[in-house]
């Protein structure tokens, strides 16, 4: 692991919003809009989460897998790299990187169980192993990911509001349905989640924020992005996006990339 975030490959790979909000040409040619591109990423992030619940891995593994997934599509198209295969492969790769290895055959078993009615999601072990090699290359073999969870706990402790831990942790989990981890340092995401939690739970920590000497404009902007996301998508925490919303988009993708 890198000594700290500021010297890590993760830090060096942070992107601007406009770099993330780009639809690859191959996907654009298939009629996929920027909003639809986002919908697929939300849908497949949820798919990773559901699959992870089946194989019982830690939240950190899920977060790393989703980060890989989102990072891949800043470089590759969904037409070329089928998200239905990339998603479980990212979970497989993340489980190894985070030292909670899940066997590929177990992922294949649960995918077939979860997606019994949709052949487009069903892949074999060799498909995952082959895609793993492609993903490693697409990620430039930079696999270290820093997450907001550790700074969140440290900052909540420092602010004296550890009673908000569960609530703020849930908000951090939800940020992985967005691209924030590709754009902002993890501690800034943590601060935004604390800011939201403190406002919604009527905890006045204004002085604490002032003592931190962070750019509150950035913290508030991230907070607004998160709140806007909640307001725009209204995702069912158990079911994800409605089928009638995501199916037409997924149908624009080739069956096998």
UniProtKB/Swiss-Prot annotation:
<keyword id="KW-0132">Cell division</keyword>
<protein>
    <recommendedName>
        <fullName>Cyclin-C1-1</fullName>
    </recommendedName>
</protein>
<dbReference type="InterPro" id="IPR006671">
    <property type="entry name" value="Cyclin_N"/>
</dbReference>
<dbReference type="Pfam" id="PF00134">
    <property type="entry name" value="Cyclin_N"/>
</dbReference>
<dbReference type="GO" id="GO:0016592">
    <property type="term" value="C:mediator complex"/>
</dbReference>
<comment type="similarity">
    <text>Belongs to the cyclin family. Cyclin C subfamily.</text>
</comment>
<dbReference type="GO" id="GO:0016538">
    <property type="term" value="F:cyclin-dependent protein serine/threonine kinase regulator activity"/>
</dbReference>
<dbReference type="InterPro" id="IPR013763">
    <property type="entry name" value="Cyclin-like_dom"/>
</dbReference>
<keyword id="KW-0195">Cyclin</keyword>
<dbReference type="InterPro" id="IPR043198">
    <property type="entry name" value="Cyclin/Ssn8"/>
</dbReference>
<dbReference type="GO" id="GO:0045944">
    <property type="term" value="P:positive regulation of transcription by RNA polymerase II"/>
</dbReference>
<keyword id="KW-0131">Cell cycle</keyword>
<dbReference type="InterPro" id="IPR036915">
    <property type="entry name" value="Cyclin-like_sf"/>
</dbReference>
<dbReference type="GO" id="GO:0051301">
    <property type="term" value="P:cell division"/>
</dbReference>
<dbReference type="GO" id="GO:0005634">
    <property type="term" value="C:nucleus"/>
</dbReference>
């Amino acid at each position: 692991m890198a000594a700290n975030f500021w010297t890590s490959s993760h830090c060096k790979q942070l992107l601007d919003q406009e770099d993330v909000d780009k639809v690859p040409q191959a996907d654009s040619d298939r009629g996929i809009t920027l909003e639809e591109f986002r919908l697929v990423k939300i849908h497949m992030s949820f798919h990773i989460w559901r699959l992870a619940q089946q194989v019982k891995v830690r939240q950190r593994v899920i977060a790393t897998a989703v980060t890989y997934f989102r990072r891949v599509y800043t470089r590759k198209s969904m037409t070329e790299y089928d998200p239905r295969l990339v998603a479980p492969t990212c979970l497989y790769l993340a489980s190894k990187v985070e030292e909670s290895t899940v066997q590929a055959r177990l992922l294949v078993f649960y995918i077939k169980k979860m997606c019994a009615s949709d052949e487009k999601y069903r892949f074999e072990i060799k498909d995952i192993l082959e895609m793993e090699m492609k993903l490693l290359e697409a990620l430039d073999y930079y696999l270290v990911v820093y997450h907001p969870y550790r700074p969140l706990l440290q900052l909540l402790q420092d602010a004296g509001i550890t009673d908000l831990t569960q609530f703020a942790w849930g908000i951090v989990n939800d940020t992985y349905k967005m691209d924030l981890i590709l754009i902002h340092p993890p501690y800034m995401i943590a601060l935004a989640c604390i800011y939201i939690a403190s406002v919604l739970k009527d905890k006045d920590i204004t002085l604490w924020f002032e003592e931190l000497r962070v750019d509150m404009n950035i913290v508030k902007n991230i907070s607004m992005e998160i709140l806007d996301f909640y307001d725009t998508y209204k995702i069912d925490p158990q079911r994800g996006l409605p089928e009638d919303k995501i199916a037409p988009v997924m149908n624009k993708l080739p069956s096998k990339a």
